[in-house]
A protein has these predicted regions:
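C-terminal catalytic domain of photolyase/cryptochrome flavoproteins
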Residues: 1-143, 151-314, 318-321
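Short glycine-rich phosphate-binding loop at a beta-alpha junction
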Residues: 324-328
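Conserved small/polar residues in nucleotide/adenosyl-binding loops
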Residues: 333-334
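Short, solvent-exposed turn/loop segments enriched in Gly/Ser/Thr/Pro and often Arg
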Residues: 147
């Protein structure tokens, strides 16, 4: 499993998956064969998260090879990420509340040995420990393993889902505020109220080809509860028409300017905005910070090849950019 840090790598991985492995995706996608065999899934999410390739681009490529009826499950899975982003976009207080809760819970659990054992992969559950190791070493987990992991974290290890979501965001190359936060809420039973996801021994054994033993889980836990409800807000957009003398700000989740809506628009200058780890609300692993930095550098290189004046700046420097600037939407920072 190789996550190159360029748009060229993303396109290469997309083409390889569609040409060689997409035809069996629906049948094999739930199997986790381990980090050395990911041929049954696309592994494109790190690039989609950073906007290096788009969901639409991926879907169009898949439909160039197979009909919708043969391709429907893959398209559904791609669009889940789009759905979650839209859902959270309309309910931003879910993210704000999560961060506020996380701040309090961090303090409460900073000396908790159960929590330390979990993030160090030192529990009495073999598969969980292996997933912790895999997450730290590869910055990726199979989607099915993420569901099992979250369920074990919440219902067997009895740890707050907020800390688990933070642990994923710290390490995952495809860590996305929407998919990650709402996915953990869904497992806990508060995203779809009263319906939680419970990992089971038979399911883990079946879909890992019996790679693990010693899987003793709480398989009868009730869902977590929350008295908070969130109403969708109304979004309004006002795209200016004359942008020629304006600057454009591009953030780390939109790193494919050349396929975006403004690709033919001339800007005075484009600023690619990075974010130092010490300024993030969720601190990222060094490997993840490097991954993001290299993707930003690749976007800069591609823009400069088109003779577009481009500069990488830190998030804290935005205030120094003159007021005739616009940000490429959506903006996302943790």
């Amino acid at each position: 499993m190789n996550f190159g840090t360029s748009r060229a790598s993303a396109i290469e991985n997309l083409n390889r998956f569609v040409d060689q492995n997409l035809f069996e995706y629906s049948k094999l996608r739930n199997f986790d064969y381990g980090p050395d065999n990911r041929s049954n899934i696309s592994c494109l999410s790190p690039y989609i998260t950073h906007g290096v390739i788009s969901e639409l681009e991926v879907i169009k490529k898949s439909l160039s090879k197979f009909s919708f009826s043969k391709n429907e499950k893959f398209i559904q899975e791609v669009l889940w990420r789009t759905y979650w982003k839209g859902w959270l976009e309309l309910r931003p207080n879910v993210w704000t509340d999560y961060l506020n809760e996380l701040k309090k819970i961090r303090e409460e659990f900073k000396d908790n040995q159960n929590y330390r054992n979990a993030i160090e992969g030192n529990t009495n559950i073999e598969c969980f420990n292996e997933w912790v190791k895999e997450l730290k070493e590869t910055n990726y987990l199979h989607n099915h393993a993420r569901m099992w992991f979250a369920s074990i974290w919440i219902f067997t290890l009895d740890l707050p889902w907020q800390l688990g979501a933070e642990f994923f965001m710290k390490h995952l190359y495809d860590g996305d505020a929407a998919s990650n936060t709402l996915g953990w809420r869904w497992v806990a039973g508060i995203q779809t109220q009263g319906k939680n996801y419970l990992a089971s021994e038979w399911n883990i054994k079946k879909f890992t080809n019996n790679r693990f033993s010693n899987i003793k889980l709480n398989e009868n836990a009730p869902p977590k509860t929350s008295n908070k409800t969130y109403v969708a807000s109304k979004l309004e957009f006002n795209n200016p028409q004359n942008l020629e003398e304006k600057n454009l700000l591009i953030f780390e989740n939109n790193l494919s300017f050349e396929i975006g809506d403004f690709k033919d628009q001339k800007f005075k200058k484009i600023f690619l905005v990075s974010n130092k780890n010490e300024n993030r609300t969720i601190e990222l692993s060094e490997k993840l910070v490097k991954f993001k930095s290299q993707l930003i550098e690749d976007q800069k290189k591609r823009l400069e090849e088109k003779s577009i004046d481009t500069e990488i700046i830190d998030l804290s420097e935005i205030q120094n950019v003159n007021e005739t600037s616009y940000g490429l939407y959506p903006v996302s920072y943790t």
